[in-house]
Amino acid sequence: KKRTRKKKPAEEAAPVEEAPAAEASSEEAPAAPRSDYDSARKFSEFPLSPEILKSIAEHGYETATGVQAATLEPALAGRDLVVRSKTGTGKTAAFCIPMVERIGSGDRVTRAIALAPTRELARQVAAECEALCKYKDIRVTAIYGGVGFGSQEQALKDGCEIVVGTPG
């Protein structure tokens, strides 16, 4: 017998706005990305701080991917997004850049939590966030099982603005 999951009625679900499709465009919107992998927009065209732009440039990136071009401005404005895209299209940076940009520096109070499905992905997301935080006074901590909890617990006690973790 096949088991199915019971879905919540739409009125109970949290409101979430989807990012515009890569092909969508309007008169007010910037040029639409050509694909999830490609965009004509440079990171310098987005409302990003000099610290973030410097970190992005040091990693050799100048042009946003299609996913990033479609999501950066709504995410920077604080809108909730649901983004689905293929592997390698820049989704991690698409949510890490606005997350790091919107967090105040140096207060050591957790401001953002990113959940990943695996330990390896949690480590990768934390590493990308740390790279973006290079010129901002923001600490990132990865929390996951399979290793001693002592150093992770100490990092939380010391304070960090971004926690990246995985269940289990």
Residue spans for each PLM region:
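Arg/Lys-rich low-complexity patches in intrinsically disordered regions that function as generic
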Residues: 1-8
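D/E-rich low-complexity acidic segments and tails
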Residues: 10-34
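Long, low-complexity, intrinsically disordered polar/charged segments
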Residues: 28-41, 98-116
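Conserved pre-motif I regulatory segment
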Residues: 33-84
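Conserved nucleic-acid-binding Ia/Ib motif block in the N-terminal RecA-like helicase ATPase lobe
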Residues: 50-62, 107-168
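Glycine-rich phosphate-binding loop at the start of an alpha helix
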Residues: 65, 93, 150
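Walker A/P-loop NTP-binding motif
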Residues: 69-81, 92-107, 113, 120-123, ...
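The conserved Walker
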Residues: 85-89
